[in-house]
Amino acid sequence: MYTYYNAHPKGLLVGDCVKRAISKAANMDYMEVQRELNRHKKVTGCANYYDHNHGTHYVEHVLHGVKMSFPAVKGKPRMNGERFCKAYPKGHYILSMAGHLSCCIDGVIYDTWDCSDKCVYTAYKVEPETKYFKILKDRDTYCAHVTNDKETYISAYMDKKRMEAYAQCLKDLGFKEREELLT
């Protein structure tokens, strides 16, 4: 199963499969992924953040993706995107194909083109970044306690009407509201 997905902020079709796959599978912002890959290329020594090998190194060592290899077996068809989706219908995966990275979430490949017939050599199971918020009230003023897996932020204080709009924006961006406060 394939669904069109283009995370590029300007909607451009460019060679950004590494950023697309990571941003979708890990539930990260596209530009945040670009910044992270730029920082990480100092570790790998790659010239470009969009290098396929650099991307898989980042997935394995920074996102702690669990590596699954699919070697060729004589007399049997190779694993491809379509067979992978059927074999692994649940979870977030980054698929390493010949010169390409793609994303599979719950049995659906998300990419700018249908690569489901390409051989999958390696897949990485990743846990998506979880983003939460909690609205706090202090007399007539509200603030949002916003967190992801790495950092915690406190938004500016605002009145109830603005906070309701802000909370809706957070929900639209994929944040989940929590009952308890995270520390």
PLM regions: where:
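Short aromatic-glycine-(Arg/Gly/Cys) micro-motifs in beta-strand/loop hairpins
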Residues: 133-152
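Active-site nucleophile-adjacent alpha helix/oxyanion-hole segment immediately C-terminal to the catalytic cysteine
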Residues: 1-47
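A short, exposed loop/beta-hairpin motif centered on an aromatic-Gly-Thr core
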Residues: 149-162
